[in-house]
Amino acid sequence: MTKFLFTSAIVLLLGCQSFQKTPDISAIDVPLTTIRFEQAFFAIDTLQLDPSLQKLAGQEHFFTQDFLYNILATTPQTAAKDVPQFMRAYQSMYKQVSTQFASLKTEEAAIKEGLQYVKYYFPDYKLPTKLITFIGPINSFGNIITIDALAVGLQMYLGKNDPIYLTEEGQNLYPVYVSRRFERAYMATNCMKNIIDDLYPLQDAGAPLCEQMVEAGKRLYFLKKVLPHEADSIVTGYTAAQLEGCYKSEKDIWSFFVQNNLLYEKDPSLIGDYMHDGPNTAVFGDSSPGFIGQFVGYRIVEAFLEKNKETSLDKLLKIPAKIIFEQAKYKP
């Protein structure tokens, strides 16, 4: 059974990738206004709830509706009870967020740079013009793309060791392999994931494993192109050690899929472990990452691009995964 191995040589290999030439985006203007919705929301007068919510909606109509009815999951009939109840329950978190996220300059800069690269590669795409921060229920949405905004739930970025994630309820919702990524360093990556989902909604349900892996690889390639300065461990979601292990064991990982006739398998019960997040991929050992199909798919995409160097990012995302897989002739 394959086990992951680690060598310092992999660190050097990954480090070299950051020196790839990136396009000059300095002249690309991307308007992005940050709106601290949580500040306006927690300032409302619950004794005058209806006019306060109407005023809030006047300031940010579309997101106020999204927040109340999708994130808080309240209704016009129950808002008078639900909103004050939520505000009381999350008042201490709001105070924490006010201190912890007093400034978002680093995150704003990374997100804006990502949008500049998106505009470079996809000039006709209508970019979000707002970055909206909010505090929502811990069991609700953390990252959203709306009609004109990227919305970020700061309750999902308090830091991996925040007590709220380590409670029994928190771990039931978000096991450690998930909550370890609840760091502000992941904010730009999560925003760009929403962009790719908007540009090219994933439609690989029922596809064989090889095609699902390629689709995941295409999306990871997109992230690396629009976030060229982010660490590989951030954009992949793997730990640095897991990523090292993937490169070191790349040949063994591929051999496993080939020898077990899994590449054209469609049964979710047989291939789900390779395409879903998890603490690890059991067959490869405790040191391996979950969602290991993303890594394999990314390497297949790289093999394809080695043979098709003039392929634009837009064109790559439009090419059927089946064609990429067949033409890549990937063999580590």
Model-derived segments and spans:
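Sec-exported extracytoplasmic/periplasmic mature domains
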Residues: 42, 119-123, 223-231, 258-262, ...
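Acidic/His/Gly-enriched intrinsically disordered linker/tail segments
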Residues: 217-281
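Acidic/His-rich structured neighborhood in mature extracellular/periplasmic domains
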Residues: 83-243, 321
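N-terminal mature-domain "stem" immediately C-terminal to a signal peptide or N-terminal signal-anchor/transmembrane
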Residues: 17-89
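C-terminal soluble interaction/assembly domains
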Residues: 264-332
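Positively charged n-region of N-terminal signal peptides that target proteins for export
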Residues: 1-4
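C-terminal motif of bacterial Sec signal peptides marking the signal peptidase cleavage site
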Residues: 13-15
